[in-house]
């Protein structure tokens, strides 16, 4: 194998657990229970009503990310203007549903925007990347989302220097599981599909996309996403340490 394709969110970087922790903490301070689930549900419902939702869906930009993305990438000015009222409405409706104080919606929306800017890695991530380099593997990052937020995560986590290539769906216009994104990486390094492997936590995006591109697929099952019977990985691991231990790559 010559090329390792890697996902970012919840593969190398803790993403969903951080959003959950921040929202639950804000909920406790606001005196409401189950705040993460309520905010997530309202955000997803209202996000689907946004005029740009088909584009967001195509590039894999989530409703939770819309609660803290800066939308500072040129061309996303309309999203930046839309985001403030969207966030306030999400928190207001979540508070109303929970019997909280809806007048605190803006305060909590702004608090989440600030406090969500955390980029903790999974404990084994750095050692895994070092081992990949020791083995002489080229590293490419394939991540879905809007450019400014994904690059903020990448830099904030101190990961940028590891990758020879970074493909962000919002920059190239296509996202996982579209096999064209995987083929872009293959072409950039001049390797055949059988000389590469994709490592990611999302069966629908990472595993399915890799299989469509003819690339070996490693599912990092962190217990955050259900198994997809139509997207079977070549290797299933509990964390990144098991990838090279399996000697399947």
From Swiss-Prot:
Its cofactor is Mg(2+); Co(2+). SUPFAM superfamilies: HAD-like (SSF56784). One of its GO terms (biological process) is dephosphorylation. One of its GO terms (molecular function) is L-phosphoserine phosphatase activity. Gene3D superfamilies: 1.20.120.1600, HAD superfamily/HAD-like. Pathway: Amino-acid biosynthesis; L-serine biosynthesis; L-serine from 3-phospho-D-glycerate: step 3/3. It is an enzyme of class 3 (hydrolase). Its EC number is 3.1.3.3. Keywords: Amino-acid biosynthesis, Cobalt, Hydrolase, Magnesium, Serine biosynthesis. Coiled coil: none annotated. It comes from the Bacteria. Disruption phenotype: Cells lacking this gene show serine auxotrophy when grown in a synthetic MP medium, in contrast to wild type. Addition of L-serine to the medium restores growth of the deletion mutant. Pfam families: Hydrolase (PF00702). It catalyses: O-phospho-L-serine + H2O = L-serine + phosphate; O-phospho-D-serine + H2O = D-serine + phosphate. InterPro entries: HAD-like_hydrolase, HAD-like_sf, HAD-SF_hydro_IA, HAD_sf, PSP_YsaA. Belongs to the HAD-like hydrolase superfamily. Catalyzes the last step of the phosphorylated serine biosynthetic pathway, i.e. dephosphorylation of O-phospho-L-serine to form L-serine. Is also able to dephosphorylate O-phospho-D-serine with similar efficiency. Displays a poor activity on L-phosphothreonine, and cannot use L-phosphotyrosine, pyridoxal phosphate, glucose 6-phosphate, or fructose 6-phosphate as substrates. Homodimer. PANTHER family: N-ACYLNEURAMINATE-9-PHOSPHATASE. This is Phosphoserine phosphatase. It comes from Thermus thermophilus (strain ATCC BAA-163 / DSM 7039 / HB27).
